Amino acid sequence: MPELPEVETVARDLRPLLVGRRIMTCHFSGKKLRLPWRDEWLAEVCGCQITSLTRRAKWLHLSLKKTGLPHGAGLIVHLGMTGQLTVVQTSADHSPKNWRPQDHIHLRMLLLSGVSPEDSLYSELLYRDARRFGGIHFFANQNELDIFYEAHPLGPEPWDCPLVDWVGKLAGTSRRIKTVLLDQKIISGIGNIYADESLHAAGIHPTRCANSLDHDEAARLLAEASGVMLRAINNRGSSIRDYVGGENLRGNHQDYLAVYGREGLACVRCGGQIQRLRIGGRSSHFCTVCQRFRKSPGRKKGDNYKNIVNTRKKDQA
């Protein structure tokens, strides 16, 4: 599944190719997607100008502008497990009749770069999704967008998460730390790949209970998660299966993964063996040496979230 680094790469690739373009035509395959598309949205989208492209966690947000369309209208895109959002050059006489089922293209938009067809270049925005676990959602105004995000609450991204809040969240749950990293309501953007990589970088076993981590371990994990994600962004994400960037180019970070997908191989840090186990139905990769399971002394009795916050405030006074 594309995670934050992959989605950020798509956003960076597509921003100069989409912003300022006008959507001339829009065609939908009619296939059922997890995030369903409605046929009545086709008329709303046609004629719109794309004014911005932003990312929030694993979501892409395209702002749209058109006469008669309320302020705040736009599109939300989630790539799911196998989704791809790419732009290709085309001509004005493109035809959706040439679609082939094996291409798995579910939405395509003809884009115009100039004011008039005579002095414009044409391109197509394509949404592919073999497993159809993603999708594109249209919202007509800011209120609809706010309602959408209320139904899909997101925690802060690793670099935006205050340490005191992070420590408090871990102190308040006995769930396994790998499971907590995947909870988008607690911390957003991390998926299976970068959860494994973050835990390895921090030297923490994935089955540890979150509330067994002491303050230093929690701080180290948050810092390593930020570093892991930023390095992956610099390498254009990890192309392990279907992922490609917005210009249909593969990422490079799969060549630098320390544990994910390396079962049975030697740890790049200590030489220990990489093993795989199942946690909550997901594969987890870890080093048997530098992530050896051990009971942490944990927090002292009464060292709960409230006390941590009060201590932090006293330190800052």
Predicted regions, residues:
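Structured catalytic/nucleic-acid-binding cores of DNA maintenance enzymes
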Residues: 1-317
